Swiss-Prot record:
The keyword DNA repair applies. It comes from the Bacteria. Residues 258-334 are annotated as: Head domain (RuvB-H). Its EC number is 3.6.4.-. This is Holliday junction branch migration complex subunit RuvB. The gene is ruvB. Residues 4-184 are annotated as: Large ATPase domain (RuvB-L). CDD domains: AAA.
Amino acid sequence: MIEADRLIQPQDLGQEDVIDRAMRPKLLDEYTGQDDTRAQLKVFIEAAKKRGEALDHMLIYGPPGLGKTTLANIVANEMGVNIKSTSGPVLEKAGDLAALLTNLEEGDVLFIDEIHRLSPVVEEILYPAMEDYQLDIMIGEGPAARSIKLDLPPFTLVGATTRAGSLTSPLRARFGIPLRLEFYNVRDLSSIVARSAKVMDVPMDEGGAEEIARRSRGTPRIANRLLRRVRDFAEVKHDGAISRAVAQSALDLLDVDSEGFDYMDRKLLLAIIDKFMGGPVGLDNLAAAIGEERETIEDVLEPFLIQQGFVQRTPRGRIATARAYSHFDLIKPD
């Protein structure tokens, strides 16, 4: 499996969630990027508040590290309600979910991260809860067992997933508001880096923010992580201020190149170019060649490489594009 301490991996590393919490926007007006999603949410939230109703159930999906948890908390703040957070793997038994549902107050947000990993038993409990605000529970065992219905207050379920295609059709159909998060552009990510630096009281100019953003793979979580490491470098090697030159030196030292690639990205690209003559190469062969799992390539390595035009996914397999060759100062054969 991929190394857990990979600097540019989009998943949370240990205590990062606690550290990042202080840097997260609390309201939609503070939220940068994802313009279409933000505009839609603003309308949906305002409409629900005008009607005095709970917001419709919402599914937020997209690559990791783009702010799904942040958006769920913003929704709760904008609606003026509480949020209870959990994740799919934690909800092992129907009783685990029932305990959460019965403690919700009217309008509250229940946030389930990695919702695609819910067990079928737990998912069955969700259906009537989402549709009718009712909880079906079994009392007793064997022939004497009976089902009773408990009424639940209207609530908003916010599900987050990196694998929307893995959700069952019945569950996916019950979300009235599907929102896809995209990778951030450099301009929006620069604004996020600048905001985080201000929260951290780190002096930084526009060039420094842009350089960190440019190497952050379009992902706020990675940008904030790189900002913390560049801050360390600036404090020890310089006067504490982050300029473009300081950011470049620090990130070069950390082996994060100008495109935001580390050794794993370069390993994947070079495997396609050198071992498979540029492709096409099947996913299983590529996974074996670089010593990684299929899921790691599909969920972690590939999305950004494809989105940035370095890898093309075809029915016959993965192909390295001319841009991938150019990154290594190579010329793609005709």
